[in-house]
Amino acid sequence: MINQAPKRSDEPVFWGLFGAGGMWGAIIAPAIVLLVGILLPLGLFPGDALGYDRILAFCQSLIGRLFLLLMIILPLWCGLHRIHHAMHDLKIHVPAGKWVFYGLAAILSVVTVIGVVTL
């Protein structure tokens, strides 16, 4: 007999955030680290293209705030998802581990949203 009320899994939502964070961390984040962490301090980037005033104006725009949110939140979800599953693989069982790790990711995401909105 087929179960008429199968248990729904919430795992696809977390895997989606994990995948998005992994892609962001693999493609976008290294480019930003290269630009801001290496090229700018060495003076290899043209003039005042990324001066304080321009960066502040970008961060206060809608697209800049969205970029900051994605730059912080997606790798955060990816990292906490990896830690959650790594602990499971190592047979270290945290009581209510899903609530601990994904709850922490959700709380830190809300803190990030508050911080970026008040920027």
UniProtKB/Swiss-Prot annotation:
GO biological-process terms attached to the record: fumarate metabolic process
GO terms of molecular function: succinate dehydrogenase activity
Subcellular location: Cell inner membrane
TM region(s), chain numbering: 25-45, 55-75, 99-119
CC terms in the record's Gene Ontology section: fumarate reductase complex; plasma membrane
Membrane topology: Multi-pass membrane protein
Top-level taxon in the UniProt lineage: Bacteria
Record key words, sorted: Cell inner membrane, Cell membrane, Membrane, Transmembrane, Transmembrane helix
Subunit structure: Part of an enzyme complex containing four subunits: a flavoprotein (FrdA), an iron-sulfur protein (FrdB), and two hydrophobic anchor proteins (FrdC and FrdD).
Function summary: Two distinct, membrane-bound, FAD-containing enzymes are responsible for the catalysis of fumarate and succinate interconversion; fumarate reductase is used in anaerobic growth, and succinate dehydrogenase is used in aerobic growth. Anchors the catalytic components of the fumarate reductase complex to the cell inner membrane, binds quinones.
Family: Belongs to the FrdD family.
Name the record gives this protein: Fumarate reductase subunit D
Organism classification: Bacteria, Pseudomonadati, Pseudomonadota, Gammaproteobacteria, Enterobacterales
